[in-house]
UniProtKB/Swiss-Prot annotation:
The N-terminal region contains the highly conserved SGGXDS motif, predicted to be a P-loop motif involved in ATP binding. This is tRNA(Ile)-lysidine synthase. Keywords: ATP-binding, Cytoplasm, Ligase, Nucleotide-binding, tRNA processing. Ligates lysine onto the cytidine present at position 34 of the AUA codon-specific tRNA(Ile) that contains the anticodon CAU, in an ATP-dependent manner. Cytidine is converted to lysidine, thus changing the amino acid specificity of the tRNA from methionine to isoleucine. One of its GO terms (biological process) is tRNA modification.
Length: 358
């Protein structure tokens, strides 16, 4: 067993907790997302222990979202409240009320959960919503993105800090294994809830979770998959930087021609300059423009790729002096109209759809 593997079963030390939460030392309030499961209970305990060692620091608000999907959920929320009280933390339970969808429950519950967490954080004046995502969660997310055919940005999976619903979402435990969180709870004598939904084969994530031991035996263990996500994130950041530069370059060209349309009218690219860019940069610039101008975004990657292929074929007819597809294109996507004539690629708001019978 390697050193890294043996460390995966050790409790998290006070020194490690200090490093994990150090980026939040100057925050006024932190909202901790605590469901009652082992990961989030470990998060709350670690955050409280870290806060207790500091003369100053953020106030910690533990928030439990009761989705009302299982009869045990109220009892689990009460368990979180009791531990939070023992740790000297403020606790709130928020309930997902209203009718639940017949299908797509995990995604609907996730959206509702983050909406409620964001609202609680905003009311408390919190700088971050802190979640207990682990390296194991990251590995599962990478696999899910692979199965969906995600691009580089998707394979980067979860970032340590990201923005959602106007707030910063922080994942300080993303580099740690779930086994270490369990070891921490055992060492501290802290109980936690066991949600059977996490093992329900009716849902994609639990099915992939059940496959992890087999994948690990072939070398695709959580550490390796998380490393893949980190490398994809680095590559994505580099490509985004290049796309920013290309976008500025095209804007300067358009300004020089005094023909760039602004505001609600849309955007314009010089066809030859656009065609000279690498394919991934062209794709990102196209998606950015569609998302800015369109009304039905964000645009789907696969549909944007198909549009770019058609645009490239049409551009070939212009840049090579030929007549491929007669050198013109007009297509709507995600509420935007993408058109190409000899002088410009234009992305503008799509006209309203006609109702049947009109």
């Amino acid at each position: 067993m390697s050193t890294g593997q043996s460390e995966d079963h050790l409790p998290i030390s006070a020194a490690e907790a200090e490093r994990l939460f150090a980026p939040f030392a100057d925050s006024g309030v932190l909202t901790l997302a605590v469901s009652g499961g082992p990961d989030s209970m470990a998060l709350m305990w670690l955050a409280a222990r870290w806060r207790a060692t500091r003369a100053g620091g953020p106030r910690l608000l533990a928030v439990t979202v009761d989705h009302g999907l299982r009869p045990e959920s109220r009892r689990e929320a009460l368990m979180v409240k009791q531990l939070a009280r023992q740790l000297g933390l403020t606790h709130r339970t928020l309930r997902w009320s209203g009718e639940k969808p017949a299908a797509g429950i995990p995604e609907a519950a996730r959206i509702a959960r983050y909406r409620l967490l964001a609202r609680a954080a905003e009311q408390a004046g919190a700088s971050h919503v802190v979640t207990a995502h682990t390296r194991d969660d990251q590995a599962e997310t990478v696999l899910m993105r692979l199965l969906r055919g995600s691009g580089i940005a998707g394979l980067a999976a979860m970032a340590p800090v990201s923005r959602r619903d106007g707030l910063l979402l922080a994942r300080p435990l993303l580099s740690l294994s779930k086994a270490r969180l369990l070891a921490t709870l055992r060492s501290a004598g802290i109980a936690f809830a066991d949600d059977p939904t996490n093992r329900d084969p009716a849902f994609t994530r639990p099915r992939l979770r059940a496959l992890m031991p087999t994948l690990a035996a072939e070398g695709a263990d959580p550490r390796t998959l998380a490393t893949l996500a980190n490398r994809a994130r680095r590559a994505n950041a580099a490509i985004e930087l290049m796309a920013d530069g290309a976008e500025r370059y095209l804007a300067l060209l358009a300004a020089g021609r005094s023909s760039k349309r602004r505001g609600g009218e849309g955007e314009m690219f010089d066809p030859r300059a656009f065609a000279a860019l690498p394919a991934e940069i062209r794709l990102r610039l196209l998606m950015r423009a569609i998302d800015r101008v369109g009304t039905e975004g964000p645009v789907e990657l696969g549909k944007a790729e198909a549009l770019l292929e058609r645009l490239d074929r049409t551009l070939a007819g212009i840049t090579d002096g030929g007549t491929a597809e007669r050198g013109t294109l007009k297509q709507t996507l995600a509420g935007a109209l993408v058109s190409l004539a000899k002088d410009a690629i234009r992305i503008s708001p799509a006209p309203p759809r006609r109702r049947r019978g009109e």
